[in-house]
Amino acid sequence: MDSKEVLVHVKNLEKNKSNDAAVLEILHVLDKEFVPTEKLLRETKVGVEVNKFKKSTNVEISKLVKKMISSWKDAINKNKRSRQAQQHHQDHAPGNAEDKTTVGESVNGVQQPASSQSDAMKQDKYVSTKPRNSKNDGVDTAIYHHKLRDQVLKALYDVLAKESEHPPQSILHTAKAIESEMNKVNNCDTNEAAYKARYRIIYSNVISKNNPDLKHKIANGDITPEFLATCDAKDLAPAPLKQKIEEIAKQNLYNAQGATIERSVTDRFTCGKCKEKKVSYYQLQTRSADEPLTTFCTCEACGNRWKFS
């Protein structure tokens, strides 16, 4: 199945997204006939489109999509390992150092230069001698004839292209999909403030040096344009920051509960930090009714807090 055939199926999936029967039929065809490669996945964005049905309310569809995505990832990883093994074998083959430019494998009886083989193995990567951006990549981002949308598209392209090995058309396709979804959710003509706010959320998180995985996930389709256009800002945060946000939220909840609930002071509890016995506490039902109450304690001497059930 070539890229043209795959693109037809991608378009049909988009057109028939509300028709479960049609979606299932298309997915089954892709599952049986589509052989995934990094190049095909980038050119067609079939992974992005299929991934949209991962949370379908139709159990058969969601189950099939999860199976397909897992199978495709395995195939890509296997192909990568095979290429790496082949490269390792070539690099360590006897006589390789003597004639790297002329010795190669025979394809249809024609001897291929080793340099050609290396280029072929890197065909999925885009290498530029200049810093990656729309200007240096020769990409026209002024496609909407709308000042704000064109500016946002250019900014998205530039931030996604920076230090990327994905080809320009693939990055442009991703940037267009993100901007289009942003404008669909918050039309820039009728809700400019929300449109700009969403752009700032996406841009600041993608460009952040503390969040290197985000751009990779967007480029590979693991994070979809639909998700980017609607998610909370904290959903894009790196794992350490997410954990800190959760800890702060828990602490705020603890403080809020302690401020509104009457506390009792007792000497029954001992502070594990300062060993004082002047402890205030309150109890809440934080789980199901048949579970024991949770006791929230605060040491009146040092302020140490703990809880137990």
Curated annotation (Swiss-Prot):
Subcellular location(s): the record lists:
Nucleus
Alphabetically sorted, this entry's keywords are:
DNA-binding, Metal-binding, Nucleus, Phosphoprotein, Transcription, Transcription regulation, Zinc, Zinc-finger
| MF term (GO), any | zinc ion binding
Instruction: Mark the TFIIS-type zinc finger spans by residue number.
Output: 267-307
What's a GO biological-process term for it?
A: transcription antitermination
> Where in the sequence does UniProt note compositional bias of the Basic and acidic residues kind?
88-102
Which Pfam families does the annotation name? Med26 (PF08711), TFIIS_M (PF07500), Zn_ribbon_TFIIS (PF01096)
Question: Where is the TFIIS N-terminal domain positioned along the sequence?
Answer: 5-79
Map out region (Disordered) in residue numbers: 78-142
Tell me if Zinc-finger is a UniProt keyword of this record: yes
Q: PTM Phosphoserine: list the residues.
A: 116
Task: Tell me, in one coarse class, where this protein mainly resides.
Answer: nucleus
Residue ranges, compositional bias (Polar residues): 103-120
Query: Which segments constitute the TFIIS central domain?
Result: 148-264
A cellular-component GO term for this protein: nucleus
Q: What else is known?
A: S-II binds to RNA-polymerase II in the absence of transcription.
Name it. Transcription elongation factor S-II
Organism field: Saccharomyces cerevisiae (strain ATCC 204508 / S288c)
